[in-house]
């Protein structure tokens, strides 16, 4: 009886071993540099099974910019005439629609005139004092940006310069981190 129980546990362990290696493979960071990194990203982005990655929950783009969550429709001239509805009369055939383009009127955008510097005559060297305030304001804004960058990256100038590829080469990247490279190709 004891021998039967041990053999069952051994078989169970052998059956679960491939699954545990697969989970470990997903979470463990691997150092990838240059061509190896590119090949791994291509393999990952080319997979049809995205169920292992819950990108909708972890996607920084959908959290920061909510309009990325909507579907984007692309224009394909080989579709039925319903996709041509914006540019043509729906009663016209597709062949005729390609030769006669009846465009609808475009929306009128209200453009805001940009605040330009006041037009004056010749400025002397001392007459440029109003512009000193704008330069100080610009300097203050750039200081705020560098403060934000410092909070995000910390006080490490190397981290600020290090890109995604350098990080994967020096430290290593897991498959979840590599999946970020596929975001431009994912249809949300």
UniProtKB/Swiss-Prot annotation:
Regarding protein family, the annotation reads: Belongs to the insulin family.
| Record protein name field | Insulin-like peptide INSL6
PROSITE patterns for the chain: INSULIN
Compartmental location: Secreted
The UniProt function text for this chain reads:
May have a role in sperm development and fertilization.
Q: Which PANTHER family match?
A: INSULIN-LIKE PEPTIDE INSL6 (PTHR12004:SF1), RELAXIN (PTHR12004)
Q: Which UniProt keywords apply?
A: Cleavage on pair of basic residues, Disulfide bond, Hormone, Secreted, Signal
GO biological process, alphabetically ordered? apoptotic process; ectopic germ cell programmed cell death; fertilization; flagellated sperm motility; male gonad development; negative regulation of apoptotic process; negative regulation of developmental process; negative regulation of reproductive process
Q: List the disulfide bonds.
A: 33-169, 45-182, 168-173
Instruction: Tell me which SMART domains the record gives.
Output: IlGF
For this record, the Gene Ontology CC terms, alphabetical, are: extracellular region
Entries under Pfam families matching the protein: Insulin
Q: Which GO terms describe its molecular function?
A: hormone activity
Where does the UniProt annotation place the signal sequence? 1-22
Q: In which tissues is it expressed?
A: Testis and prostate specific.
Keyword presence, Mitochondrion: no
The record's annotation in InterPro entries points to: Insulin-like, Insulin-like_pep_6, Insulin-like_sf, Insulin_CS, Repro_Hormone_Insulin-like
State the source organism's domain of life: Eukaryota
Q: Which residues form the propeptide?
A: 53-158
């Amino acid at each position: 009886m004891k021998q039967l129980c041990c053999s069952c546990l051994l078989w169970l362990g052998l059956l679960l071993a491939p699954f545990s290696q697969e989970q470990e493979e997903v979470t463990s960071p691997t150092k990838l540099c240059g061509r190896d990194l590119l090949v791994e990203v291509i393999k990952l982005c080319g997979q049809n099974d995205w169920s292992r990655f819950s990108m909708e929950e972890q996607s920084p783009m959908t959290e920061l910019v909510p309009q990325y969550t909507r579907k984007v429709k692309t224009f394909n001239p080989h579709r039925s005439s319903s996709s041509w509805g914006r540019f043509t009369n729906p009663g016209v055939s597709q062949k005729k629609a390609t030769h006669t383009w009846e465009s609808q009127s475009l929306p009128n955008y209200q453009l805001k005139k940009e605040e330009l510097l006041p037009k004056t005559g010749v400025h002397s060297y001392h007459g440029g004092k109003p512009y000193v305030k704008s330069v100080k304001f610009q300097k203050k804004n750039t200081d705020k940006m560098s403060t934000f960058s410092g909070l995000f990256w910390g006080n490490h100038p190397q981290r600020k310069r290090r890109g995604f590829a350098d990080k994967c080469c020096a430290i290593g990247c897991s498959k979840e981190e590599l999946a970020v490279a596929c975001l431009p190709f994912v249809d949300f």
